[in-house]
Amino acid sequence: ARKYGLDDRQVYEIGIAGLLHDIGKSKVPNEILNKAARLTDEEFAIMKQHSVYGYRILQSKEDLSMEIKLGVLQHHEKMNGKGYPMGITGDKIDLFARLISVSDIYDALVTERPYKKPFSPRDAVEMIMSMTEELDITVMRCFLESVILYPVGTDVALSNGETARIVENVPNAVLRPKVLGLTTGKV
């Protein structure tokens, strides 16, 4: 949110929205929420209602901004209109929802589920980078610039078999940090 240029109040509120974005899952039956297999189409239709349920839970909370409430309601909307619950597109999707969406997708990809193994952080970033029709590109870039896949000082194996040490992360090339070859001494 900071990378996107939001002010202190907005950063605070997007944090609240992020914490509350799945509150509507409290209204989804446990047998669906905790199912150890992939959901059926009927079960998924019920699960997709969690964002509406969350909005309804928060609707009467006068101390929460409309941006927080819309972030909860719209966090599964996609820029191309193929999201839910309303199928809205582009700038019709609240900024908070667009911000939450990228983080929510990353979390879903790297988290183990009973029906799937987690993806590596690198694979998750690659998948997110391919979602240019679904996600707000500016929000995606801000998220990717904030993700540190390879902490400085970490040793990694390069594709040529050499071992190298991460010396710098490159903001616009999150998958290609600067490295120092440990045997060659070259950056």
What annotation goes with each model-predicted range?
Residues 1-187:
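Histidine- and acidic-residue-rich, metal-dependent catalytic cores
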